[in-house]
């Protein structure tokens, strides 16, 4: 009896489990044998590797009437899914006294700078919310990547608008002028006094 094992196979990660299962089942059927009397080919089978990565080692055996069983071993491997790397936006600070529209635009553009790599079928989301008030405030945003082969990855970044400087109003000192000046003089002094605020 001669037995021919399947070639060792390596499949890429990020396929569906159904795809891996089908390829594994098809791979099992590629084992062959020749010779022997009433030979029967079996395999230890088992489950296909996880689609996120792993190896199944299979023993193929031919039993026949006139010889001891013949065996061979082959492996079916799924490469490990690439690790998710989440890149958070840098914390951002904007000055106050811009329009709310301008702050909203900058906030949305900032949200879009988050990125990720790796993983299988990853989706990037964020807790978003509203931009800070253009007069001052901070919005803290959680960014999350969910994927098929890892627990969710998260990071947090902040977008801040610096609080406006409080207004300090300095009134002119109360003024008293003597009578009997011309109206032009009084008008001039009054206007000058207004300008001291």
PLM region spans:
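Proline-threonine-serine-rich low-complexity tracts
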Residues: 1-197
